[in-house]
Amino acid sequence: MFFNPVLYKKSATDKIFFYETEIVNECADSNVVTAELNKMIVENYAGDCSDVACEKIYIHPEMTDDVIAMIKEHGGEYKKNDEGFALLIGKEIHIWVEDKKGILFAVASLRSMAETGDLTPSFVYDYPRSSVRGYRVFIPGREQFDQFKRIIDMLVYYKYNILMLEIGGAMEYKKHPEINEKWVEYCEYLSEFPNKCAYHRNKFNHVRDSAHPENGKGSFITQEEMKELIRYCEERNIEIIPEVPGLSHCEYIVMAHPEISELKRSSKFGDTYCPSNPKSYELMFDVFDEIIDVFKPKRINIDHDEYNIVGYCEECRKKNPVDIYTEDIIKTYNYLKSKGVEVITEGDKLMDVGGGAGYNEPGDWDYVPPTYPCRDKLPKDMTVINWYAGFGEKSEKPLLECGFELLYGNFRPATFEDWKGRTERGRIEGAMPANWGPFENVYLQRNQQIFDLIYSAYIFWNFEYDDSKKAEVFDKVAEESFRYYNKYFE
């Protein structure tokens, strides 16, 4: 089978098939669980098969002492984990879970075993290595909703639990409709021809790393449409973490309110609000309020990455860049905490990446002052996303030494070095592959999204994976990617 569970004991070579199989769910009713099991039952029906017919599938709401004893009898070690599950597969299939969120993970394992011909009488016990198993994406365009749901179904199949969704200007703001209006105008401008962002950057000598006109497919969806997507995810135990760009990457706000822009030179590309202007926070917090009202999130990613337009207005020029950055994050942190929301931030501006650019030299657009000393002054209950993790363990040591918990962002598992060692030594919650492009199949393939998601899923649920197994796992993931894509995306 594709996954390598913590414990797998095969008791016979007979194949399980489904014929008039009854589902007995002792947990809370779940139409999604029933639908997922019925997919497996219908797709793997074999009434003329001479092997073992599964008569009933039972779903039990707790790991009983008998199940824990069964784990030990089979040579396993029980570990309490809210996402853990046990399977006893035979004439009847029994699913035991610690918490209802584990049910779909158990069902996903059954489906995978059935589809790959590995569903035989056996006992399986499993729980994830990584507590955060996420995927970072843009909001889909209205015409992409079916494809978006197809991707969520894939996350369920490969036992993910997080979707990080960049909001920006791609969701309706009822209090500030001008944000959406200017967002569409901005996206149309950037989409005039390929790589218009780089053209504009060079034309205006503008310090900027990226722009995201793909978000919402260059438009925006209504709050009701967003709630439909949220419901789809929630029903499948996928937690959505809104990614709400703050300070930097704020073009969706700044375009509509150029009076708060730190950059006056180019009204088309002001992407940073002035942290010395109180109106910046009035607008930013209005945006947070609407997003909190729609999503009811446990946590929000405030971004703050690629902060390059630093200290250009008269007020900000008088301040230390480290203080500017620190005060902005703390102000945002305090506001979200007052709303009961935990805070995630990007980590690139918390790192000393070297270089000798100075702040006191008044050259035009030719320096970005360092802000990394602020890491000692920030609240340590924030989670920091390290998307420089591909450069090695040195990228995360200073952040771990400061006391932050980390996530690996822009995760590319096939080339990532020492996953096992680094996640054992540091406070690493997990990782997230990222999609910075559209949802169409051709882009998913070109950008290796299917491959990265499946490879990541394999190591999120595998305690034995290390660098020595890369070649073996690469081949296994390539085969599985081909199988899944052709079954569910074509």
PLM features per residue range, with description:
Residues 66-68, 142-146, 394:
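Short, solvent-exposed loop/turn elements at domain surfaces
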Residues 1-11, 27-34, 50, 115, ...:
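Substrate-binding groove of N-acetylhexosamine-processing glycoside hydrolases
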Residues 80-316, 321-331, 337-339:
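Feature activates predominantly on carbohydrate-active enzymes
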Residues 16-26, 54-57, 93, 133, ...:
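Hydrophobic beta-strand segments of well-ordered beta-sheets in folded domains
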Residues 26, 43, 55, 144-147, ...:
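Residue-identity detector for glutamine
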Residues 1-101, 105, 109-125, 345-352, ...:
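Acidic, contiguous N-terminal accessory segments
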Residues 69, 253, 312, 355-356, ...:
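Short, well-ordered secondary-structure micro-motifs
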Residues 61, 167, 435:
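Short secondary-structure boundary segments
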